[in-house]
Structures are given as structure tokens and as C-alpha cells.
Amino acid sequence: MDLSKFLKEKRLQAGLSQGAVAKKLGYTSPQFVSNWERGLSQPPVATLRKIAQIYNISANDMFEVMLKATIDQVTAELTEKFYKQAKTK
């Protein structure tokens, strides 16, 4: 699961709207939260900690999701490069 899906899932489990989360974080528009949940941008690390508090989840769980997504992305990129190089030889 990537961070965007994780954030949306946890917000819904907390019973909060995007607008309510934005307001708790001090944003004037829910568009920030929407963008995070659609993977268009990522919240700053300090904001992730606040989100964890608002959703009553462990910040470590959130960072583990981010780490796994990064590892998966790097693995996919390296695999693609490996196969491209193998085809040219």
C-alpha cells in the first residue's frame, strides 16, 4: 500500500472528512488533503506526525508504509534497468 491510500484509509477509519483534517492541520482548503490522498503530493514530515496524532495511529506505521513504497519503487526501477541491459547484450 502506498502512502496516499494509507492516508485515505486511516482518515476514513477515524471518521473524518478531508475538510475536518485540513482544518485540524491549519489549512484553509481540503485540497491539500485531497492531493495527498490522490498521490499528487506528499505532506511534509512534520505534518505527517500531526496526521498520525489526528488519526490516532503510530507515526512509525506511517513511516513504514513510506519506506516500503520507496523500496518497492527502487526495486522496480532496478529490475527494469537490469532487463534493459540484459536485452542489449
Positions of predicted regions on the chain:
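Residues in the recognition helix of alpha-helical DNA-binding motifs
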Residues: K10, K24, N35-W36, V65
